[in-house]
Amino acid sequence: MASTSTSTQPSGWRHTASQYAALTKPRVTQLAVFCAVIGMFLATPGMVPWPVLIGGAVGIWLFAGAAFAINCLVERKIDAMMRRTAWRPSASGELGARQILLFSLVLGGAGMWTLHVFANDLTMWLTFATFIGYAIIYTLLLKPATPQNIVIGGLSGAMPPALGWAAVANSVPAEAWILVLIIFTWTPPHFWALALYRRADYAKSGLPMLPITHGEKFTLLHILLYTLIMVAATILPFVHGMSGYLYLAVALVLGFGFLVHAWRMYRNYSDALAQKTFRYSIVYLSLLFAALLIDHYFKFGPQGAAL
């Protein structure tokens, strides 16, 4: 009996740990931290100091996890209605409200301390403001109130490059805000593609998502329009002198691919196309920022002295 108890205990701990980890929405957090790290490298012509790189990334990850945990806490009843999110420990009841709140407070507190020690106070307070923007303003106020929630609230999700930049430079210049603008304009077509092929789920939730309140064709038109705006925004790093021809070529090719996805959906919508567009949007952003990083260090073509 003793051996059986010993052998099953670790799996119990692993399960609990995985439940808490799920609250942080790991895939979304990874993309946010990736964009923050790119912002760190773009803020300096040389190497980012290791303490700042690691400490800044960890601090931003902790804050992001705290914000997503609060989101799961606030939306636990809504998540329970939706097939896509019903498995979350907050929705299933495997973790209670007090546990989730305490977990979020611990992550947020640890994030503040980490950024204060390894980065700077500007980064700490900007990240805290981003936390408030997502966990409170977006989740509590905007998301249940307006179908434009993802547009207005998208700023908090677009902040990671500026946070990374601030961690290295202790400032947030125009170059950092260009990166924020790219993600800000990327967010609506990315999210609305998901909302389209998951609209049955969102209809159950009662949240005023654009496909529910304004219909499929209206949403598809807005995806197409925002994709055009996003492609224009991605050219700004080249225009501003942050990048060279390699980035410009990658941005144009990737942007053309995004436009093709958006146009195909608009002309002949299917859930399969929406799902492909959603997945492409994640690859798109990752490759776009990777191209920025490569061009930053290898100098493919004329770059200004913006830094």
UniProtKB/Swiss-Prot annotation:
EC number from the UniProt entry: 2.5.1.141
Keyword Lyase: no
CDD domains given in the database record: PT_UbiA_Cox10
Keyword Cell membrane: yes
Superkingdom: Bacteria
Cellular component terms per the entry's GO annotation: plasma membrane
Catalytic activity from the UniProt record: heme b + (2E,6E)-farnesyl diphosphate + H2O = Fe(II)-heme o + diphosphate
Protein keywords: Cell inner membrane, Cell membrane, Heme biosynthesis, Membrane, Transferase, Transmembrane, Transmembrane helix
Location(s), subcellular: Cell inner membrane
Top enzyme category: transferase
Transmembrane parts of this sequence: 28-48, 50-70, 100-120, 122-142, 149-169, 176-196, 218-238, 243-263, 282-302
Pathway: Porphyrin-containing compound metabolism; heme O biosynthesis; heme O from protoheme: step 1/1
Chief location bin: membrane
Pfam family, one: UbiA
Membrane topology category: Multi-pass membrane protein
InterPro entries noted in UniProt: Protohaem_IX_farnesylTrfase, UbiA_prenyltransferase, UbiA_prenylTrfase_CS, UbiA_sf
A GO term for molecular function: protoheme IX farnesyltransferase activity
Gene Ontology biological process: heme O biosynthetic process
Family, similarity comment: Belongs to the UbiA prenyltransferase family. Protoheme IX farnesyltransferase subfamily.
Task performed by this protein: Converts heme B (protoheme IX) to heme O by substitution of the vinyl group on carbon 2 of heme B porphyrin ring with a hydroxyethyl farnesyl side group.
NCBIfam families the UniProt entry points to: cyoE_ctaB (TIGR01473), PRK04375.1-2 (NF003349)
Miscellaneous: Carbon 2 of the heme B porphyrin ring is defined according to the Fischer nomenclature.
Protein name: Protoheme IX farnesyltransferase
